[in-house]
Amino acid sequence: MRNAIRRQWTSSSSQVAKRKTKPRTLANNPSPCSFSGTPHEAAEPSRISTPLVVELSDPKSFHLGMFEIGRPLGKGMLGRVYLARERTNGFLCALKVLYKKELQESRIEEQVHREIEIQSNVRHPNILRLYGHFQDSQRVCLILEFAAKGELYRQLVKEGRFSERKSARYIAQMAFALDYLHRKHIMHRDIKPENILIGIHGEIKLSDFGWSVYSPNRRRNTVCGTLQYLSPELIQLLEQPTSVRYDETIDLWSLGVLTYELVVGQPPFFDTQDCMTQKRITQADMTVPSFVSPEAKDLIQKLLVLEPKRRASLKEVQTHSWIIKHCVENHNTAREILSNATSNKSLN
């Protein structure tokens, strides 16, 4: 049933394509090593408006022969991910291989171009690192951080739902990652368990920036994402394509949906019919089970607010009583605890 409710929304009036509807097969074994290359300094991503001709700053920096290709880690609609080892120093990474013909046929060249541009310019311990990329006549390859414990969604399927302690720690890390992105004027626009990976130490890694966008003016009108996680303003755009513009608060709504799904085990607005799911979203029609604590329920209700500007801010999420209860120890702040927990795991 879980796979059946995770539909990727498509619309002829929006820049959305079908994507995977079931968990990827991800490995749980080898530990990542430290990357020996020199990282680029973090910079504001520039807006992308050109078709996909991926230009490398130094085309000779990377090539397929540099890597020993290992077992498959996952397969999506348009790409495959493999465990790979850099031949010179043994550095383990994930190599995402995209085929140009498939990208062109699906008309998502700009999406991939934007993903590369944005993800290569962000540096945060809770965001999956893109070390570099290269291409040949047939393929575009992304060199990604290897998240050894795989997909959050796979773990959620296995456990059914998470404890509130685990959920709160994941949500706190997500809030820190989103705060970092929003300060750089980046909207992720596709937050869901399938797009969150888990590192070797249990820290989360926000991934899949295919629908993300750099938007300094903070107003957009393109519908994209996954139906269960769409905000009310995006649903309104589906019905009246030119009537609404939205900003980064759509990520706050998605964070609320994620919080609910982690502690309950399914999205809050699920219905067997998509039209009813849309209706429930536009009315914020949800029922929080009695086993959910009052603190968790309060945070969910403060994020899943119909009026975008009334949703809890990321700062309010980070200092919410539910987060403090499960993340704070020895009177330190939640930020200090989680910063210490991730500082030793981030790559230099």
Residue ranges and their predicted role:
Residues 1-62:
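Intrinsically disordered, low-complexity regulatory segments that flank or precede the catalytic domain
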Residues 80:
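Conserved N-lobe ATP-binding subsite of Hanks-type protein kinase domains
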Residues 97-122:
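Conserved N-lobe beta3->alphaC-helix segment of eukaryotic protein kinase catalytic domains
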Residues 133:
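Activation-segment/catalytic-loop signature of the eukaryotic protein kinase fold
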Residues 138-151, 155:
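Conserved short submotifs of the Hanks-type protein kinase catalytic core
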Residues 170-171:
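Activation segment signature within eukaryotic-like protein kinase domains
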